[in-house]
């Protein structure tokens, strides 16, 4: 069994406070989330970050871990808990955003916990008959196109399982079809009642909480419910005007570029943005950007020379005032 340096996994110092630990975890969770990352080992890194936050995000588990860390464990090196080591117990539970399988190292430290071998996991269970199931937190990556899609998005996540005594026995994978609400924004938290862990002894199921993370788009920037797209133009298109095919979330449109258009100018396309809470769409703004050719042949340079001689234009006239 190898030692796991949870501080190193999250990339924080051992003196890091709760806020820094949570921020580091969220950054890694977004980076390696299976719905977002294309890296081959993303799932393993995601689970590793989740396990680290399960420990460091809870003061009781962190205190136990810090105590055993004093025995000189090094990340990735063989490790064995000291003789007679026994978990100090406690309700605990950093409440990592998504459940997952924990390592042998985790189990060797926290698996002997009386009453609930893995702690409360951030749930709201009570120590009485008919206990409510644990809530589950999950970050959900949403693409801009999906906010306009009327179809449901299928998600899979891990739900903790318990026995009749309320002791954690493992995890099971649950799959749901989720409708993305109109007007959803980055960081918004959505509650799905009763979709968390099952209750114990007839208790109610926990809830599933989805924290929305809008995935970056290669073409569009977001400003509220409006979209911004940069439209490259050749110098002659800006000077003479043109019809340009511009992408939107639902297909291309033909945008009219008026003669003598300026770089940086924004053209508004009404109703082609994102949905708001009322189901109305914002606007699309096409920001013009004049782009020079990378290379010019002799004939093209001759035309530029003729233009420079005939055009009575100085873009720096304001400097002479």
UniProtKB/Swiss-Prot annotation:
The UniProt record lists the keyword Isomerase: no
Keyword tags: Chaperone, Cytoplasm, DNA-binding
Entry keyword annotation includes Chaperone: yes
Chief localization: cytoplasm
SMART domains named among the record's database cross-references: DnaJ
Ranges annotated as biased composition (Gly residues): 87-97
Chain spans, region Disordered: 74-97
One GO term of the biological process aspect: protein refolding
GO cellular component terms, semicolon-separated: cytoplasm; nucleoid
Gene Ontology MF: a single term: unfolded protein binding
Function comment: DNA-binding protein that preferentially recognizes a curved DNA sequence. It is probably a functional analog of DnaJ; displays overlapping activities with DnaJ, but functions under different conditions, probably acting as a molecular chaperone in an adaptive response to environmental stresses other than heat shock. Lacks autonomous chaperone activity; binds native substrates and targets them for recognition by DnaK. Its activity is inhibited by the binding of CbpM.
Protein name per its UniProtKB record: Curved DNA-binding protein
Source organism per UniProt: Pseudomonas entomophila (strain L48)
